Amino acid sequence: MAHQDLPTTDSFLAAAERAHDANSASEALQPFLPDPPCKEVDDAVLGPQSTGRTAELFSQSTPPLVPLVCFAAEIRGLYSQIDATSVISPLREVLSHPDLHANLLRMPRLVSQLAHAVAEKASLFPGLCAADILEQLYKVLSHEYQGVTNVHAPLLSELVRTSQIQKAEQVCRGTDITQSDFTLHLPRVLDFLEYLYLAGMIFLQIGAYDEALHMWDTAVSLPLEPAQAHQCASLKRVILLRLLRDGSIPSAETLFPFLDAVACSNYKRECNVYFQFAQVYGAYVLGSPNLLRDMVQNSKLEFEGDNTLDLVEQCLQARPKHAICSLARVYKTFP
């Protein structure tokens, strides 16, 4: 955004005056929601030296979208625990607004930016009560809707960070990815990919391998160019989890049934070490265990960087079992 085009505090207050309902608010506030967020715009929203605290000035007299724009800007700029604690009470008041659901559906970008700002500041400022805020947003958006919203991923991230795995599992099991609305609830496909990746991680943690694979397979199968980071991260785990569960991985045609040759080639390049590991893993020949160990040692930094070393080690521990099962299948073919 060019400097001369930056909005001012006066223009924000004027926009707030024009916001009489959800429709007029969403139209008037668009200039104050750049993607990605911009500090200069946040400063304009909050007023000189953040003294305006504009959210408190009109939270009762305007649609909730107006103060939520303020809260998103304020949370992004938090610098102290005291400031974080002071946000909670007025924010909760706005989140209890009777028309909040209809308002949130008018500005999905605002919802996404607010949710991600809360999740990103959560570890720095426990007084922000991030999980409570995100749960409240999630419940409002999930009213009579079972698909993924743009609050799902930040909520799961915070629940995992605070070791609330049972609650995270409930969110995942209560969500039907096939019912996702990519207009009102989830306009950014990246939010969907992030949810699929995190849901897969949660299912993996509780030992629900089939559900984890379903999440990650879905992420990998989306035809995006280029492949996104969460897709590559999901594929790496698909390969390892299939090795852990089955002892091998299917062909590329089976693994990527909806992707063209270019997309498959990109995935193979991005996840080359994992495909090599799978190839050696499935070769039950003399010396292959040592070769596998050497591969893991040589690629240890990559596995650690991908946070998959734990899963790799589990695969190595399960390999003798898969080798025995493979021999049993061979013996059954003898006359």
Language-model-derived ranges and their functions:
Residues 2-125:
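Eukaryote-biased activation of long, low-complexity terminal tails and linkers
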Residues 84, 124-127, 165, 209:
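TPR-repeat structural position
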Residues 92-100, 135-142, 172-184, 217-224:
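Amphipathic alpha-helical segments of tetratricopeptide repeats
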Residues 105, 109, 145-146, 190, ...:
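Residue signature of alpha-solenoid helical repeat architecture, marking inter-repeat boundaries
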Residues 111, 115-118, 134, 152, ...:
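TPR repeat positional signature
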Residues 192-199, 204-335:
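Alpha-helical scaffold segments of alpha-solenoid architecture
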